[in-house]
From Swiss-Prot:
Name of the molecule in the record: Large ribosomal subunit protein uL29
Gene (UniProt): rpmC
Pfam families: Ribosomal_L29
Coiled coil location: none
Keywords: Ribonucleoprotein, Ribosomal protein
Amino acid sequence: MKATELRDKSAQQLNEQLLELLRDQFNLRMQKATGQLGQSHLLSQVKRDIARVKTVLSQQAGK
């Protein structure tokens, strides 16, 4: 996911995307805790995506 793609979305779409990413992060953390997570890079990838969405939301709120 690119920041330029996110800037084209509305605040409502970004909030929906943020909720989805937070759910994904929770599920990945649970998989890691139970030893079922095979692709550990997904945790950091989702974490960065959450940060991107939050950054774009705060930039849009500042305008």
